[in-house]
Amino acid sequence: MSMRTEYCGLVTEHLLGQTVSLCGWVQRRRDHGGVIFIDLRDREGLVQVVCDPDRGEMFATAEGVRNEFCVQIKGLVRNRPEGTVNAGLKSGKIEVLCHELIVLNASVTPPFQLDDDNLSETTRLTHRVLDLRRPQMQHNLRLRYRVAIEARKYLDEQGFIDIETPMLTKSTPEGARDYLVPSRVNAGQFFALPQSPQLFKQLLMVANFDRYYQITKCFRDEDLRADRQPEFTQIDCETSFLGEQEIRDLFEDMIRHIFKTTIDVELDAKFPVMPYSEAMARFGSDKPDLRVKLEFTELTDAMKDVDFKVFSTPANAKDGRVAALRVPKGGELSRGDIDGYTEFVRIYGAKGLAWIKVNEKAKGRDGLQSPIVKNLHDASIAAILERTGAEDGDIIFFAADRAKVVNDSLGALRLKIGHSEFGKANGLVEAGWKPLWVVDFPMFEYDDEDARYVAAHHPFTSPKDEHLEYLETDPGRCLAKAYDMVLNGWEIGGGSVRIHREEVQSKVFRALKIGAEEAQAKFGFLLDALQYGAPPHGGIAFGLDRIVTMMAGADSIRDVIAFPKTQRAQDLLTQAPSPVDERQLRELHIRLRQPEQPKA
């Protein structure tokens, strides 16, 4: 008999009366009146093993095993006694009567119980090998595998070719910082780890591969959040001779396919499409969570002439905004709740949080409860009530500041209230999945510090055809052929139609204040390639880590990556990054400059 004939979790009634050989880890050992029970675990689940004292040598071995010992057992599959069936296990109707038990490897006492749900992330990541034995982590990584497999199946059926692109490439410092790799052979020169395969996949389109994809690692040296890692995985795709709508349709179908085949979820037959400007106006975000049934109300124009400077000053400022968020039944919120929300929005730069409770709308200002009502004239109050559609029992929150502060703070408040216990109890948030496309992004954003425009996505995104003329006259008016797929408030994919004409690409570089010499030094290979009959092309990249995180209901993408980094970009398991030998540095022609120590 081979070392293993079945997986533990797959031993069911179909094997009754048969002798099986199983391998796995001891989840738990119990001694009941001289009979030893072992819960044996492998990647497929648990099976109960019964060790009878009649088999002396085997029983003596069973007395010595402990949690996480790696063992092999041979035994007979039989029904569990009446009243001992475990409906929670696939193998719960049977047990294995042990005939032979071999300890393949003993284990020291684990630093934690695998069924402890209150472990700190530091403990889990330090002992990641043990953490990965936990059923939830096994589930998450197998789900990740299934998502990748289904993506490959779909793309293969659509004629896409899996092509690898370089991991050691040229540094083009636009946007996030590059991870740099020093070259030993070329002293004083550096490779960069790719932030994406963007330029190489465009070159593959010029090279007539027509449809490309790869599931690949990307690297960005940036500050980390719950949904960011220094190295992350993209489902990266590019295609020739398709327009923006066709590209969106193609990859919308892919996401529908993946959700149906992996977690049996039917996403909308057609994803709604929302312009960037509408998303910002209604939700203050370019990745709105449509499950939350709260929206902004625009009040900037109605607050220009009020005596309340908190509102009128931003209302009259060039980059100012005044917006309201009506919360149905929010009159129930206590002053303590409101104070908590006020402190919350300060995180996003807001100076405070104005509010009005609507007690009796029919009484006008006399039916309103708020410290700010006395500062507003009747016309502004009427505009607030009419535009928000407020009813008795509602509360209206206000944000007034620079547009970015208003969008960030009120947008965060919208999500916080919607997903709160109050929001759930009052029907302010829906369950399920709410996908959409956000389109028509600005092509450029103005950087006040550098006094120049920067690319909102990347500098290879095509402007809308009707906006080509603005590249040289008014770049801020340009909209891009860019699109993001958003799901439940997460951007899970983003892409664009690319620039395929050298003269247009050069105009974009000029709009970004990248001169001809600099453009040639950084991107000459792309500009040259575009001159050889480059086809119209575009693509998209999906964040595999984010998609699996959402499907698994995980708190962080670190829960769907086998060996992730912390928020300080450290690997607690291997203790990376770490110092290297001085000899290695000399070979790379590198001398370290130690950071200055703070003065005492």
Curated annotation (Swiss-Prot):
Reactions catalysed according to its record: tRNA(Asx) + L-aspartate + ATP = L-aspartyl-tRNA(Asx) + AMP + diphosphate
UniProt keyword annotation of Protein biosynthesis present: yes
Subunit structure: Homodimer.
Keywords on record: Aminoacyl-tRNA synthetase, ATP-binding, Cytoplasm, Ligase, Nucleotide-binding, Protein biosynthesis
Binding site for ATP: R220, D221, E222, Q229, E491, G543, L544, D545, R546
Name of the gene encoding the protein in the UniProt record: aspS
Gene Ontology MF, one: aspartate-tRNA ligase activity
Subcellular location: Cytoplasm
GO cellular component: cytoplasm
GO BP annotations, alphabetical order: aspartyl-tRNA aminoacylation
Its EC number(s): 6.1.1.23
Family assignment from sequence similarity: Belongs to the class-II aminoacyl-tRNA synthetase family. Type 1 subfamily.
Pfam families membership: GAD (PF02938), tRNA-synt_2 (PF00152), tRNA_anti-codon (PF01336)
Function statement: Aspartyl-tRNA synthetase with relaxed tRNA specificity since it is able to aspartylate not only its cognate tRNA(Asp) but also tRNA(Asn). Reaction proceeds in two steps: L-aspartate is first activated by ATP to form Asp-AMP and then transferred to the acceptor end of tRNA(Asp/Asn).
UniProt keyword annotation of DNA-binding present: no
Name this polypeptide is given: Aspartate--tRNA(Asp/Asn) ligase
Residues annotated as site: Important for tRNA non-discrimination: H32, G83
Region (Aspartate): 198-201
Residues binding L-aspartate: E174, R220, H457, R498
Entry superkingdom: Bacteria
